[in-house]
């Protein structure tokens, strides 16, 4: 046995240089040199190590909560408009500032298209072998039909009822709660009810416990071997897919038997009953993937945002008092036990300013990715076809040029006309604006209304450490002590 181990490691040491050389030459072939017939050079920058590129440095900045530093250093060294790097095994251009954001958001399907890291492709394989980007383009319109303003209006009352029930079972009987844990339960419950009309508590708990395991695999090294974050995430997605496919099969039966006639059409029924642009219907596995993706996206986005909203309201009593005043006025305008409606949410202007300021300081994700579908030039530099581009929200969100004293929590930034165009991009922009933005707004505001009109609270760990992996979260989940108004 010992001899075999020695032989194994000896061979590994001999082969390692060859593997590194192979990786290097394979990678450099993917980075086109300046075209002979093109006068534009490639963007300035560096590609770092073979395959790894500058990914480790980038992830280090992300996990430290200072992803803007990754951009700032390279803007100063290479170009304030665009620079070259290598992330996630891909040659990548970073287009900087609001000008870069506007360019990428306005050239969707003309020069660029959405791109997902290989980790996402491995976790969510499509039934016909097409990429997630192509599949999502086909189904986006179907999802937007229900997730845009007109589609979400009818869910306000239902969502308020779910929140009030949640408050009764999880808040009113407690003196202390862990915000992160209770918000997780709330967001998963809400997505299950709105997207799939699931109200079975045990099933909601199973889905919620699985969804949180996906997050770690999104930016993981795409190596699927036992023990890796990617392997755990893939196993989780398979389990979730089986669970959601069972819900889909039952819904098909219910639709055939007309059992859903009295129910408002949720996203699941809409995806089952509506054909794509090409006249084809989605497979059960593809519908499951899209529903899981939406649930995971909502889980990641909303958990952090709502948790940090409660954190800042505890830290800034004057902000809390203004939110309370706004929400009490809305509550007093309604009959006892009357549920919120769309017009009530439109009145929550200051509350939404608070949520937006949280989204500015703590964006709900690391940013979005695009892929060049043709050669094009930007700021005098060639972006070759196949290159990837990365939009990093902190590049503008924490830039004092666009947000003076960017580390200061100040909801008044969003009063009046608000920030300059393309400087505030937590949900993307242009035709690729996140389809769930209205859903997210409803979930956040309904939560704020119900909690603020019932409680004040104080943090039990005043200077609790914030971890980022890759989404910011409190090390201990933000435990708070509740003080009911009555």
From Swiss-Prot:
Q: Which residues bind heme?
A: 434
Name of the gene this protein is made from: CYP716A47
The GO biological-process annotations, alphabetized, read as:
response to molecule of fungal origin; sterol metabolic process; terpenoid biosynthetic process
**Signal peptide location in the record?**
none
Listed GO cellular component terms?
membrane
Q: Annotated Gene Ontology MF terms?
A: dammarenediol 12-hydroxylase activity; heme binding; iron ion binding
Known tissue expression = Accumulates ubiquitously in all organs of plants. Mostly expressed in leaves and flowers, and, to a lower extent, in roots and stems.
| Reported biotechnological use | Transgenic tobacco plants coexpressing PgDDS and PgPPDS1/CYP716A47 accumulate dammarene sapogenin (protopanaxadiol, PPD).
Which Gene3D superfamilies does this UniProt record tie to the protein?
A: Cytochrome P450 (1.10.630.10)
Name what cofactor the protein needs. heme
Please give the pathway this protein is involved in.
Secondary metabolite biosynthesis; terpenoid biosynthesis
Enzyme class comes to oxidoreductase
Q: Give a yes or no for keyword Oxidoreductase in this entry.
A: yes
Q: Which PROSITE patterns does this UniProt record tie to the protein? A: CYTOCHROME_P450 (PS00086)
Superkingdom classification of source: Eukaryota
- Give the induction annotation: Up-regulated by methyl jasmonate (MeJA). Induced by A.niger mycelium-derived elicitor, thus improving ginsenosides production in adventitious roots culture. Slightly induced by Tween 80. Influenced in roots by soil water potential, and in leaves by temperature, rain and relative humidity.
EC numbers, comma separated:
1.14.14.120
**Protein topology in the membrane:** Single-pass membrane protein
What this chain does, per the entry, is described as:
Component of the dammarane-type triterpene saponins (e.g. ginsenosides or panaxosides) biosynthetic pathway.
Q: Which residues cross the membrane?
A: 8-28
Reaction equations catalysed:
dammarenediol-II + reduced [NADPH--hemoprotein reductase] + O2 = (20S)-protopanaxadiol + oxidized [NADPH--hemoprotein reductase] + H2O + H(+); (20S)-20-O-(beta-D-glucosyl)-3-hydroxydammarene + reduced [NADPH--hemoprotein reductase] + O2 = (20S)-ginsenoside C-K + oxidized [NADPH--hemoprotein reductase] + H2O + H(+)
Say yes or no: keyword Ribonucleoprotein present.
Answer: no
InterPro entries in the cross-refs: Cyt_P450, Cyt_P450_CS, Cyt_P450_E_grp-I, Cyt_P450_sf
Q: What's the name of the protein?
A: Dammarenediol 12-hydroxylase
Its annotated compartments are: Membrane
Q: Which CDD domains match?
A: CYP90-like (cd11043)
Q: Which family does it belong to?
A: Belongs to the cytochrome P450 family.
């Amino acid at each position: 046995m010992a001899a075999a181990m020695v032989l194994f490691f000896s061979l590994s040491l001999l082969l390692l240089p060859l593997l590194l050389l192979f990786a290097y030459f394979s990678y450099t072939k993917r980075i086109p040199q300046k075209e002979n017939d093109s006068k534009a050079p490639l963007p300035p920058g560096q590609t770092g190590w073979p395959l790894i590129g500058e990914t480790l440095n980038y992830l280090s900045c992300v996990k430290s909560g200072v992803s803007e530093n990754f951009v700032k250093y390279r803007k100063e060294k290479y170009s304030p408009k665009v620079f070259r790097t290598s992330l996630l095994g891909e040659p990548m251009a970073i287009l900087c500032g609001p000008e870069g954001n506007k360019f990428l958001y306005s050239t969707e399907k003309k020069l660029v298209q959405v791109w997902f890291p290989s980790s996402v492709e491995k976790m969510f394989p499509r039934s016909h072998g097409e990429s997630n980007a192509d599949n999502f383009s086909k189904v986006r319109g179907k999802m937007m039909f229900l997730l845009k303003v007109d589609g979400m209006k009818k869910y306000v009352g239902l969502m308020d009822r779910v929140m009030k029930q949640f408050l009764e079972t999880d808040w009113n009987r407690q003196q202390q709660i862990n915000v992160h844990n209770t918000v997780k339960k709330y967001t998963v419950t809400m997505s299950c009810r709105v997207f799939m009309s699931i109200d079975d508590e045990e099933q909601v708990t199973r889905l919620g416990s699985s969804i949180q395991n996906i997050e770690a695999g999104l930016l993981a090294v795409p190596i699927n071997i036992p023990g890796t974050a990617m392997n755990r995430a893939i196993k989780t997605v398979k389990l979730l897919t089986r669970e959601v496919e069972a819900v889909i099969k039952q819904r098909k039966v219910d639709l055939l038997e007309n059992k859903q006639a009295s129910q408002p059409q949720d996203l699941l029924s809409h995806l089952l009953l509506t054909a794509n642009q090409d006249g084809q219907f989605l497979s059960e596995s593809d519908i499951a993937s899209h529903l899981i993706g939406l649930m995971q996206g909502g889980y990641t986005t909303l958990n952090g945002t709502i948790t940090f909203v409660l954190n800042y309201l505890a830290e800034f009593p004057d902000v809390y008092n203004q939110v309370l005043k706004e929400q009490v006025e809305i509550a007093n305008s309604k009959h006892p036990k009357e549920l919120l409606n769309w017009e009530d949410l439109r009145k929550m202007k200051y509350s939404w300013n608070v949520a937006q300021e949280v989204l500015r300081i703590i964006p709900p994700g690391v940013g979005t990715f695009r892929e060049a579908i043709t050669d094009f030039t930007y700021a005098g530099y060639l972006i070759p076809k196949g290159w990837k581009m990365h939009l990093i929200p902190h590049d503008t969100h924490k830039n004092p040029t666009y947000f003076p004293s960017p580390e200061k929590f100040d909801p008044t930034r969003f009063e009046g006309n608000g920030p300059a165009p393309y400087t505030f991009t937590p949900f993307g922009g242009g035709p690729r604006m996140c389809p769930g933005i209205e859903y997210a707004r409803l979930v956040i505001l309904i939560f704020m209304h119900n909690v603020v009109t019932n409680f004040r609270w104080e943090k039990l760990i005043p200077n609790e450490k914030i971890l980022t992996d890759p989404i910011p979260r409190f090390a201990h989940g933000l435990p708070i002590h509740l003080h009911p108004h009555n």
